[in-house]
A protein has these predicted regions:
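Single conserved hydrophobic/aromatic residue that forms the stacking wall/gate
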Residues: 1-17, 21
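Residues at secondary-structure transition points
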Residues: 7-8, 12, 155, 159, ...
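Hydrophobic alpha-helical transmembrane segments of multi-pass inner membrane proteins, especially
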Residues: 15-127, 166-226, 251-255, 271-273
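Glycine/serine-rich anion-binding loops at beta->alpha junctions
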Residues: 15-18, 57-59, 139-143, 234-248
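Juxtamembrane/interfacial segments around transmembrane helices
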Residues: 91-103, 115-119, 135-147, 229-233, ...
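TM-adjacent membrane-interface loops and short helices in multi-pass inner/ER membrane proteins
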Residues: 113, 117-161, 172-176
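A juxtamembrane structural motif centered on a specific transmembrane helix
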Residues: 221-273
Length: 273
């Protein structure tokens, strides 16, 4: 993991160890035995908490939150007693003030602007203001492909990355947004259904964790570009520019499709028998 320095990149795409790890973290429960007791789940929890803390110190709050929530969802799906899940959640909520108190100056600025973007309209609040204008101006049918004023005239920063969805909503409008979210919903639904019908416990938990990961990506990015939460740098799946993020997400969906295929092969064998 890269600590306290930006991730290395190439001219073709950016690559960050944390991007790869947040997809790998749903395998952390692999070392846990099939037990609801806490002592059998200590190793997976350690494999989630330590990297989350290190990534938080990069600082990369968005990625740390993704790894932490998605990793613990995997432990939860593995059958840990609910009381331990509630206990762990309570510790997280109690530690929120500590995390806020140790935020970097630019992160605190984002938090302040979140409550009042007009407080710094040409600084920290500029991104969210332009994003809202882009989304609102798209209307029902949008302005047309490559015809968005906020994106094409470069009013909207990071339009190829975290705010890619705002660009698409400006160009395609509410109708295009409905189509995009329908595809995302279908991917989540397929992942959850595969989790239910998977042949192995490992595949079941992994597919459920992938569904949680997709939901977190979509929810956080949508809330971010609409001003419901502060900007934390979480891209929209499959649409935002990126190297390792796109590859690892595709690998995750490939895992889901393979688990589903194995289940179909088993059913075909039963029918032919």
């Amino acid at each position: 993991l890269m600590i306290r320095r930006p991730p290395r990149s190439t001219p073709l795409y950016s690559s960050a160890a944390s991007d790869v790890y947040k997809r790998q973290s749903y395998y952390s429960f692999f070392g846990a035995k099939k037990s609801k007791k806490l002592r059998f789940n200590i190793l997976p929890i350690i494999l989630i908490v330590i990297p989350s803390f290190l990534i938080l110190n990069q600082p990369d709050l968005g990625t740390a939150v993704l790894i932490f929530i998605m990793g613990f969802s995997a432990v939860f799906f593995s059958g840990l007693y609910l009381k331990w899940v509630v206990f762990g959640s309570s510790i997280v909520f109690i530690s929120i003030p500590v995390v806020i108190a140790n935020l970097k100056p630019y992160q605190m600025k984002r938090l302040e602007v979140f409550f009042d973007p007009d407080k710094d309209p040409f600084g920290s609040g500029y991104h969210i203001i332009q994003s809202k204008i882009a989304i609102g101006s798209g209307g029902l049918t949008g302005k047309g492909f490559m015809s968005g004023t906020q994106s094409q005239l470069n009013f909207l920063p990071e339009k190829h990355n975290d705010f890619m969805l705002a660009v698409l909503l400006e160009e395609t409008g509410l109708i295009g947004g409905f189509f995009i979210f329908s595809i995302f919903f279908y991917l989540i639904l397929i992942s959850m259904h595969t989790s239910i019908v998977a042949r192995s416990r490992f595949s079941s938990i992994a597919c459920a964790s992938i569904a949680v990961l997709l939901f977190l990506y979509i929810f956080i990015n949508c809330a971010m570009i609409t001003g419901l939460i502060p900007i934390v740098g979480v891209p929209i799946p499959m649409l935002s520019y990126g190297g390792s993020a796109v590859i690892s997400l595709c690998a995750a969906m490939g895992f889901v499709l393979n688990a589903r295929r194995q289940r179909d092969i088993k059913l075909e064998g039963i029918i032919n028998a």
